[in-house]
Amino acid sequence: MQRPKVDDDLTLATDFGKTEAFVVEVLDNPATEEGVLLKVMTRGPFEQGQQVWIVDRDGSKVGANVENVSEQTIDNEVTLSTVLPA
């Protein structure tokens, strides 16, 4: 999986099914050497600490942790932390 860019579409697999998201910000995660923080806009009942999967176009999955959820009208701004494979 390549490092996402702003405005990329992502598919997230969660406890409540699959949902679409789009990337609004990509940052290096200072807590982990190769970690990435992704701020995405998406819909669904996300909670801090929740585990989700980012599903790549080829069907491969990368685990991510919900770091923060900020409700914005219908959509939520969700911050995900992950380590992308090289």
Where are these regions (language model features)?
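Beta-strand/loop-dominated core regions that host nucleotide or nucleotide-derived cofactor-binding catalytic loops
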Residues: 1-86
